[in-house]
Amino acid sequence: FGRLLSVRRSQTRGKEGPYLLFLLTNSRKCMRREGYIIEEIVEYSNMSEAFEAVLRGTDRKESIQGKKLLAHREEVISKLTAAIENGSFQLGGYHETEIKEYGKSRILQILSMHDRIAVYAVMNVVDRHLQKRYIRTTGASIKRRGTHDLMHCIRTDLQKDPEGTLYAYKFDIRRFYDNVQQDFVMWCFRRIFKDERLLVLLERFVTMLPEGISFGLRSSQGAGNLLLSVFLDHYLKDKYGVR
């Protein structure tokens, strides 16, 4: 059957259970854990970038929240920096709205802009460290990747090895965010990071909802990619040589 081309993937989800427990207990690949991540997060340049990113666009700047934040920009950055640095930052709640995307209805959790600045600052650094661990064809929510980049990779493989790419397995994971098991996500984060202050913050993001991970929280994009990277991508590539 030649080489299997794994085409991935819209972030929807399927069943955990015994299969993932098997992967969890049989994971043999050791990773060197990284520390001192909080120090990178609280650098002024990163906190300032997070502030600007969350308040981009006229509508956000002209909103009640936006005007208040802009009027106290340096104070907001200073307080959020301190809260992240000492590990005391807590999400202050959210409201929900229903959106339709690709023919599906989804419930989106929306944080205050204030909290989004902190989450953005944390994940801006965390994502940079996580992306080094992903396989080349991980593309969801990653700058300069995505659908077009993945299509280029597929076309290149098809041209270089027509016989080896004769067969492919395309699949989807149903309701990914809704059904993710939070303890699996945190196990993955702990496998990569040893900074306890960071892990406390990440756990607060992951457990914001009673079950699953938030569809509207930026951290969920990285958490989803990481979960699939550990339990699917590297498992298939490292154990079975799937290309």
Protein language model regions, located:
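Active-site-proximal segment of RNA-dependent polymerases
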Residues: 17, 22, 33-38, 119, ...
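Conserved pre-motif C helix in the palm subdomain of viral-like polymerases
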Residues: 105-135, 210-238
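Glycine-/proline-rich flexible loop or hinge segments
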Residues: 54-67, 99-109, 135-137
